[in-house]
Amino acid sequence: MSDEEVAVFLEEQRVVICATNGPHGWPHLMPLWYVVRDGDVWAWTYAKSQKVRNLDRDRRGTLQLETGDEYQELRGVMIEADATIHRDHELIVEFGVELMRRYAAGATGPEVMDAVRTQAAKRVALQFVARRVASWDHRKLGGVY
């Protein structure tokens, strides 16, 4: 995929699989809701989660998004990234509101802000800065494999 196609694909998809390096050498994979901000993938999660502990120890992570059921429909993006863990409460609240706008369409108003503010106290924001991006789109193969 071109850079533009990758950007559109990231906007279309809803869940990213985040792989971090676990404490015993095994990959730790978890699904995350996300938002693309200035070309970086951002997510939030509980501050005490295993993925945060893993990223505290080793900031490298791999993100993968994919779609398609039949071989000729498969599309995806894999992003090798460095993660920054943001712990600033106001930044987390701001990001949480942005995340809710994406995933809870129509959720606005003071009750949403109160809910986000409450959740933000237990969360961190994760910013994934791409080092390398790989993508595939089997629809472009035209049935020739």
Predicted features along the sequence, with ranges:
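Extreme N-terminal tail/first-helix region
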Residues: 1-15, 145
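Structured helix-beta-strand junction loops
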Residues: 12-13, 57-58, 122
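Charged, gly/pro-rich active-site loop segments
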Residues: 71-145
